[in-house]
Swiss-Prot record:
Subunit structure: Interacts with TRIM3; the interaction positively affects motility of KIF21B. Interacts with GABARAP and GABA(A) receptor subunits: GABRG2, GABRA1 and GABRA2. May interact with GABA(A) receptor subunits: GABRB2 and GABRB3.
Full protein name: Kinesin-like protein KIF21B
Gene: Kif21b
Residue ranges with Polar residues bias: 1194-1214
Modified residues (Phosphoserine): S580, S1145, S1163, S1212, S1238
Source organism: Rattus norvegicus
InterPro entries: KIF21A/B_hel_1, KIF21A/B_hel_2, Kinesin-like_fam, Kinesin_motor_CS, Kinesin_motor_dom, Kinesin_motor_dom_sf, P-loop_NTPase, WD40/YVTN_repeat-like_dom_sf
Length: 1634
């Protein structure tokens, strides 16, 4: 590896093979690799050069060995390393890195990380083994691993087993830090200590399977996050000792050598980075979460590209590198420009479909080659110092050795230099080297000459043989060998003679010098040895040389004698040839036997290898088929048993053979011994018989001795005979064992075959299951995508219908108002109109001190009212929208005038013109590239279509050939069509190639433009010129922004016109169907025709009778007149119900309008359209929306109950509350801008429109509807809203009760309201839905397990949420009020009604659940916040999934409220029993557990009961009877009133459209407060029982009490309240905090 210093980032490019899908769709390969060069050609001639390039057919092993293996070796030397995989999605990054463990891969397909792990542990074992062989202390290694995932800019720990896999959106606690040396490290990450390769692979597999993946259109398993797998290697090894001179170190006394073993510690970290693929959303088809992930991935890669550009661009001299723009670049700070050896592997696709992505990837990788890293060894400071000292000692020792050897000398002047001896020695060494080179050359020349001589002599001998007619190739070869041997012997002879001559000369010199040396030097024998021995040695050498010479001469003579004897020579040659052939055959046979033996051994090795592979495959943990596993286990067990038995038989057979040989040898030995003894006995007896001095005693002794020996030998013989019998028996058993062995071997072979077949079957089954699972996953992803698309269409249609409803309602209001304008006004009403001054706003200035003034009263004519109304409208438009639009014009003119007054210098003007031209060129170039990309994508799609058509035609032709091959005409036509399609495809391919070439040319031009960068012009500007250029840029930006705004306004205007046209056509269709319906009552055929038309057009009615409409249908289509609030009650099933709405609207239209009325209506409609188009302001803005609602809303009284065309009996409760008290003041919040009208004077029918519309009820619906036959008792039980007359003394109260809703049997705990609907929840375990227009209960939502403590209605989705016990029930009231889902406090989602079977009240919650105290909806309607226990759970309503928690309270959360900040983020404020109010500010990504942003202090003295927010002001009410006012921006307490009520403050709300606060207490009192100075305005006894909840809509105030009633209140402005002394005293006690 390289030493310390700069090291460039190396870049490798891998081109993946084409996919089968790409081949089927006809994609061409647009990349090519230059052979032998690391160069990629994109298109025709655009070349990119890198460090390594791998083509389509490159194996994984080649990539690893070429790129990564050296980095692993560098880690052992203490160098950091990084491997970075980059490329578009589906380019093969995960496959290259080897982190895709979802599929089984073979060893050849293993990626970089598994191979690097194996290499790492091989290196560890090798170094330990090498140290053991050398007898030194082995190195110690410690390996640890980390696996991080960067998902949506959040760092997740893939090794953290405690992390919830579904909680990916939660904020992690992992932090990134930088040490003193600039190294990057993380805290809060799990680091696992690794002991073996298998353990590390298992950790890698676990982390890889936990990584976020999903399916897109480009890739079935697409990585949705960046993954960084890090291996930390710590090594402690023995330091290498330097070579010492004479084993001493300078400075040590007496030349003692240093003792002890020194160690050094090296650390290294290896990053394996698998980046997520760069994506184009239009190609991946990602929506929802996938789109969000893709955007986050592209942002991280953009930041990485900026870092690479900053590091690699040498011309700009970039000072700042934006590492902190992304967590990805921060983590890779070491790898890019830091202490690491980095290699980047750019994975690209070869298909022309991915041409732009491939081009961008290659450019991206090309920039990375310019990055220089500063690579140093990671060594501890002690080891570094010891290494430096060792190097210094070695240098000094070398210098000392040179002084001692005389190489270095010190001159007279003290300067160091080299000695003359050293220079002479160097010169002689140089000369010696030259001579050696010359000797070597001459030796080679001699060898060549000898070869030539040998060849020539052999040719000569062959010619002689040819002339004699006895030529043979074998004889010629033999002659050549002999001649070569003769020449070699001749050369050796010459060398021996030369050596002999030199020895003779030396011997003569020694003999001549010997007498003198003996007498002169007594020490001569010590140096020269004995003269006699030297003489003997010399004579011996001479004698041997002579013998060799004579032998060589004789051999030469014999060789020469052989040449004339041709016949003898031929015979000997043939004989030698036959001998050589026999020896060759013997050698061949021996080699063949050896090959057979080696082949057998290889087969045995292969069998054993296959058995091992089968055993390994048996242990595969991926198999999950139980039957296969059981069979495989049994089979493996039997094989092992049989194998053991075979081994035992073989061992016993070997032991038997050994015993056999031993017994046979002993038997032979004993037999020989017996025979020798017998012979000796006979010889001795014979000798005794011949002896003359024979004694009987001696004979007996000898005889006894021999008899004893014979008996012993006989005993031994008997033992041996028994052993021989045993041996015979064993031999018999051996044959039986051999038969059993063969049988068992046969069974084992059969079992192995069965095992192989079973394994093959298992693999096929696994492959089939994998394919089925992949197919199902793809189908599920497609269905999910289709569902998202349908949901998007539904939302678009709902939005369109809401807009249609708004326009229709406004049209109806305009018509009704204009009809009322033509009627006379009573004097009383006209006088009340005059009470309000013209410039009176929504009521903010109403207070106790200003209500005493009275305005003059008098009658006004209708024309004066109309003129006043028009003046107010014009004044409003002039103050707000027109000023907003035109406000920029004076400023812009002033700015232009100021700019024109400034004088531009000629140089600044020229620079500005140059910059402007450059900007225009860049813009035009990019537009051209975008257009070319669009053309190329269009051509690719067209080519795919043509390919599909071509394949269909080919299949059709094949089918036609198979069915009727005689139809040549049809086949010819199909062939012609296929040829035409092929020609079209070729033309499209040529066009695609041209587009690619053009894009490449533009890219080169772009690079040229970038090379002459505008920064050069800007950097050459002076300060004044820079200011002028900045001024011009500002003007140009303003102009461009204005142009864009104008274009957007035109687009919105055209879209509005298009919507209006669609609504007009839809209205005409509905009116036509209404007219046909009236005619169809008597014609069944016409009814059927209308029914079919309705179903074809998608707006069929759900009613059983065409002429009647149900109450549910009406409630879904009808909205209160005069309301333009965004929270209006609008339903999504409007296409089916628009006809009913038109029918009602037609009844409200009355007589035709005159021309003046039509003009006014047209002006009002155009006004609304202008506001909706957003040119002046957005109508969705709360301020302008309120203004518009007060400006263009028309009076509602007198038009609430339109006249009827049919008469019937009085069954509606509205007829019983039609009369009003003449003395009661009739007030409206619209009095400031809406011209009032007198009560209707025309006669009414007994049966009004609402009773007619609600007369038809559908059976089986969950809505508890009433019909015409309902009795009065049933109506009372169902619930009704009854009006209340003015009470005595009510003129002094700030609120006036106008209606009362009754119907619950137990205390009402919660309520929610819109302009048309009221929702209430009670202790009777039910919720009720009321129609505020008809005054009736329209539905009862029952089946709750306990008290209903909270209820909310979402106007965006039309869903109702009710809380009871630990459940949140979700009701869909658009069709029939049914519970569609049940949410639990623990975060579970249950489809349908989970509490349906609950017939009795549930006192306790289920195990693991907590009581839910309150809930709140986000203003956008997408989030639901549920307070359960001491936390608030966040639900995403689009998916009905919990995504996070708000924690921080130590007591139960009793109340919460939600608002939106200026950046459209949710701001949640919670109040708890722990007396604290906490604020949570949420961001874009809401995941995990979120802590409070701020704790409001000081806390209350008791638990918090209610909260209310208006703007930046927060009010909190507590059980301590006090109310506090907080500033959300400054996050501090503004004011507090300790005893605002006598009892608990239970509810807070705001007066609609006025800066006034409403508070209600447990004693039943309602108080009104001024929001600005927090002073009381008035109070009223609202209920006799505790008030539990309060809410408002745009007109009314609703209070729910424990007296089972809901009261509807109106605010009464302009009245002086008679405040009690206690209330007035509160003003003095109000505490204002700094």
């Amino acid at each position: 590896m390289a030493g310390q210093g700069d090291c460039c980032v190396k870049v490798a490019v891998r081109i993946r093979p084409q996919l089968s899908k790409e081949k089927i769709e006809g994609c061409h390969i647009c990349t090519s690799v230059t052979p032998g060069e690391p160069q990629v050609l994109l298109g025709k001639d655009k070349a990119f050069t890198y460090d390594f390039v791998f083509d389509l057919d490159t194996w994984q092993e080649q990539i690893y060995s070429t790129c990564v293996s050296k980095l692993i070796e560098g880690c052992f030397e203490g160098y950091n390393a990084t491997v970075l995989a980059y490329g578009q999605t589906g380019a093969g990054k995960t496959y290259t890195m080897g982190t895709g463990f979802d599929t089984v891969t073979s060893e050849e397909e293993q990626g970089i990380i598994p191979r690097a792990i194996a290499h790492l542990f091989r290196g560890i074992d090798e170094r330990k083994r090498r140290a053991q062989e050398q007898g030194v202390t082995g190195p110690e290694f410690k390996v640890s691993a980390q696996f991080l995932e960067l998902y949506n800019e959040e760092i997740l720990d893939l090794f953290d087993s405690t992390r919830d896999p579904d909680a990916r959106h939660r904020r992690s606690n992992i932090k990134i830090h930088e040490d003193a040396n600039g190294g990057i490290y993380t805290t809060g990450v799990t680091s696992r200590l690794i002991n073996s390769q298998e353990e590390l692979i298992q950790c890698l597999k676990q982390g890889a399977l936990s990584r976020t993946t999903a399916s897109t259109q480009m890739n079935v398993q697409s990585s949705r996050s960046h993954a960084i797998f890090t291996i930390h290697l710590c090594q402690m090894r023995v330091c290498a000792q330097p070579d010492l001179v004479n084993e001493t170190v300078t400075g040590l006394p007496d030349g003692t050598a240093p003792t002890g073993t020194e160690y050094e510690t090296l650390t290294a970290k290896f990053h394996f980075v698998d980046l997520a693929g760069s994506e184009r959303l239009k190609r991946t088809g990602a929506t929802g979460e996938r789109a969000k992930e893709g955007i986050s991935i592209n942002c991280g890669l953009l930041a990485l590209g900026n870092v690479i550009s900053a590091l690699g661009d040498q011309s700009k001299k970039v000072v700042h590198v934006p590492y902190r723009d992304s967590k990805l670049t921060r983590l890779l700070q070491d790898s890019l420009g830091g202490n690491s050896q980095t290699i980047m592997i750019a994975c690209v696709s070869p298909s022309d479909r991915d041409f732009m992505e491939t081009l961008n990837t290659l450019k991206y990788a090309n920039r990375a080659r310019n990055i220089k890293n500063k690579v140093v060894v990671n060594q501890d400071k002690t080891s570094q110092q010891i290494s430096a000292l060792r190097a210094e000692i070695a240098r000094l020792q070398m210098e000392l050795m040179e002084y001692k050897a005389g190489k270095r000398v010190i001159g007279e002047d003290g300067a160091e230099g080299y000695s003359d001896l050293f220079r002479e020695n160097a010169m002689l060494q140089k000369e010696n080297g030259a001579l050696r080179l010359r000797v070597k050359a001459m030796q080679e020349a001699i060898d060549a000459i000898n070869n030539r001589v040998t060849q020539l002599m052999s040719q000569e001998a062959n010619l002689l043989l040819a002339k004699a007619g006895d030529g043979n190739e074998a004889i010629g070869a033999l002659i050549q060998n002999y001649i070569r041997e003769i020449e070699e012997l001749r050369t050796k002879l010459l060398e021996s003679e030369a050596m002999n001559e030199s020895l003779r000369r030396s011997l003569s010199r020694a003999s001549a010098r010997n007498p003198y040396s003996l007498g002169a030097s007594p020490a001569g024998p010590a140096f020269g040895g004995s003269p006699a021995s030297s003489m003997e040695d010399a004579s011996e050498v001479i004698r041997r040389a002579k013998q060799d010479l004579e032998r060589l001469k004789k051999k030469e003579v014999r060789q020469r004698r052989k040449s004339p004897e041709k016949e003898a020579f031929k015979k000997r040659a043939k004989l030698q040839q036959e001998n050589s052939e026999e020896t060759d055959e013997n050698e061949a046979e021996e080699e063949e036997e050896e090959r057979d033996e080696s082949g057998c051994e290889e087969e045995e090795d292969e069998d054993s290898g296959s058995e091992e592979s089968l055993v390994d495959s048996d242990s595969d943990p991926e198999e999950k088929e139980v039957n296969f596993q059981a069979d495989l286990a049994d089979l493996t067990c039997e094989i092992e048993i049989k194998q053991k038995l075979i081994d035992e038989l073989e061992n016993s057979q070997r032991r038997l053979q050994t015993l056999k040989h031993q017994y046979e040898e002993k038997l032979i030995l004993l037999q020989n011994k017996i025979r020798d003894t017998q012979l000796e006995r006979d010889r001795v007896l014979q000798n005794l018989s011949t002896m003359e001095c024979y004694t009987e005693e001696k004979a007996n002794k000898i005889k006894a001795d021999y008899e004893k020996r014979l008996r012993e030998m006989n005993r031994d013989l008997q033992k041996l005979q028994a052993a021989q019998k045993e041996h015979a028996r064993l031999l018999k058993n051996q044959s039986r064992y051999e038969r059993e062995l063969k049988k068992l071997q046969t069974e084992v072979a059969e079992m192995k075959k069965a095992k192989v077949a079973l394994m093959k079957q298992m693999r096929e089954e696994q492959q089939r299951r994998r394919l089925v699972e992949t197919k199902r996953n793809r189908e599920i992803a497609q269905l999910k995508k289709e569902q998202r698309r349908q949901e998007f269409q539904i939302r678009a249609l709902e939005s369109q219908k809401r807009q249609q409803e708004i326009v229709l309602r406004r049209k109806t209001q305009e018509v009704s108002a204009l009809r009322r304008l033509a009627k006379p006004m009573s004097e009383r009403v006209a006088g009340r109109v005059g009470l309000k001054p013209p410039n009176m706003d929504s009521g903010a200035e109403v207070s106790a001190s200003t209500t005493s003034s009275e305005a003059e009263s008098g009658a006004r004519s209708v024309s004066s009212i109309v003129r006043q109304w028009n003046r107010k409208i014009n004044h409003f438009l002039g103050d707000h929208p027109t000023a907003t639009v035109n406000g920029a014009r004076p400023a812009r003119k002033k700015f232009q005038k100021k700019g024109a007054s400034q004088s531009f210098s000629k140089a600044a003007r020229l620079k500005w013109q140059s910059l402007e031209r450059r900007i225009i060129d860049i813009v035009m170039q990019r537009m051209t590239i975008v257009n070319l990309e669009a053309d190329m994508e269009r051509l690719i799609k067209k080519r795919e279509e043509l390919f599909l058509l071509q394949e269909a035609l080919r299949r059709k032709r094949e089918r036609l050939q198979a069915e009727s091959p005689e139809e040549e005409k049809g086949l010819q036509e199909l062939a012609e069509e296929i040829e035409v399609l092929a020609a079209n495809i070729d033309y499209i391919n040529d066009s695609i190639t041209d587009c690619q070439a053009t894009i490449m040319q533009l890219e080169e031009t772009k690079e040229e433009l970038d090379s002459t960068d505008t920064s050069v012009v800007i950097s050459s500007c002076s300060l004044a010129e820079a200011r002028l250029l900045l001024d011009n840029f500002l003007k140009a930006s303003i102009d461009k922004g204005l142009q864009v705004a104008q274009k957007e306004a035109q687009i919105r205007l055209l879209e509005g016109r298009l919507r209006q046209t669609d609504m007009t056509g839809s209205s005409q269709n509905h009116l036509l169907l209404d007219a046909l319906r009236e005619k169809a009552e008597a014609h069944p055929e016409l009814q059927a025709l209308i029914y079919n038309v309705q179903h074809e057009n998608g707006y069929a009615s759900t009613d059983e009778e065409v002429s009647e409409f149900s109450e549910g249908s009406f409630s879904q289509s009808f909205t209160m007149k005069g309301s333009t609030s965004h929270d209006d009650f609008k339903f999504k099933g409007e296409p089916k119900l628009s006809a009913q709405m038109k029918a009602v609207s037609a009844e409200c239209l009355g007589p035709p309008l005159d021309s003046s009325t039509k003009n006014i209506t047209k002006s009002l409609a155009s006004l609304v359209e202008i506001k909706e188009d957003g040119v002046g302001f957005s109508i969705r803005d709360p301020y302008y929306r309120d203004k518009v609602s007060r400006t263009v809303s028309l009076p509602t009284r007198g038009s609430t109950f339109p006249r009827q065309s049919r008469g019937a009996t009085d069954t509606s409760p509205l007829t019983r509350r039609k009369s009003y008290d003449r003395g009661q003041p009739i007030r409206s919040t619209d009095i400031g801008f809406t011209p009032p009208s007198s009560p209707p004077t025309r006669p009414r029918n007994d049966r009004n429109v609402f009773s007619r519309l609600t007369s038809n009820q559908s059976q089986g619906s969950a809505l508890d509807k009433s019909d015409d036959s309902d009795s009065s008792l049933s109506e009372v039980l169902r619930g009704i809203i009854t009006p209340i007359g003015g009470a005595k003394g009510a003129r002094t109260a700030p609120l006036q009760c106008v209606s009362m809703a009754e119907g619950h049997t137990k205390p009402i705990l919660c309520l929610d309201a819109t302009d048309e609907l009221l929702f209430t929840g009670s202790k009777d375990r039910s919720c009720k839905m009321w129609n505020l227009v008809t005054g009736q209960e329209i539905a009862a939502l029952k089946g709750h397990p306990n008290n209903v403590v909270s209820i909310k209605y979402c106007s965006h989705s039309g869903l109702v949420f009710s809380v009871s016990s630990s459940y949140v029930k979700v009701w869909d009231i658009r069709d029939s009020a049914k519970c569609i889902r049940t949410l639990t406090s623990s975060g579970q989602v249950i489809s349908g009604d989970a509490c349906m079977a609950t017939s009795t009240r549930a006192i306790t919650s289920s195990q693991g659940e907590h009581q839910i105290n309150q809930m709140a909806l986000s203003p956008s309607g997408t989030m639901l916040y549920v307070a359960s226990g001491n936390a608030v759970r966040i639900w995403e309503l689009n998916r009905f999934q919990p995504i996070g928690k708000l924690t921080g309270h130590i007591g139960p959360v009793m109340c919460l409220t939600v608002t939106q900040t200026s950046n459209q983020h949710d701001l949640v404020v919670t109040g708890s029993k722990d007396h604290y109010v906490k604020m949570f500010q949420l961001g874009d990504c809401v995941t995990g557990t979120i802590g409070p942003t701020h704790n409001f202090e000081p806390p209350h003295y008791d638990g918090i009961e209610c909260l209310a927010i208006q703007g930046d002001i927060l009010f909190s009410g507590s059980r301590d009877n006090g109310i506090k006012k907080w500033d959300l921006d400054q996050q501090e307490l503004i004011q507090q009133i300790p005893n605002a009520h006598k009892d608990w403050v239970c509810a807070l709300a705001f007066v609609p459209g006025r800066p006034m606060l409403l508070s209600a207490c447990r004693a039943g009192f309602i108080k009104v407060w001024n929001v600005d100075n927090f002073t009381p305005i008035g109070e009223i006894k609202g209920h006799d029982s505790p008030i539990n909840a309060i809410c408002t809509n745009s007109k009314h105030i609703f209070t729910a009490s424990s007296d089972c009633r809901v009261k509807l209140w109106n605010y009464v402005p302009g009245l002086t309240p008679c405040l009690p002394r206690r209330v007035l005293a509160i003003k003095g006690r109000a505490t204002t905090l700094p």
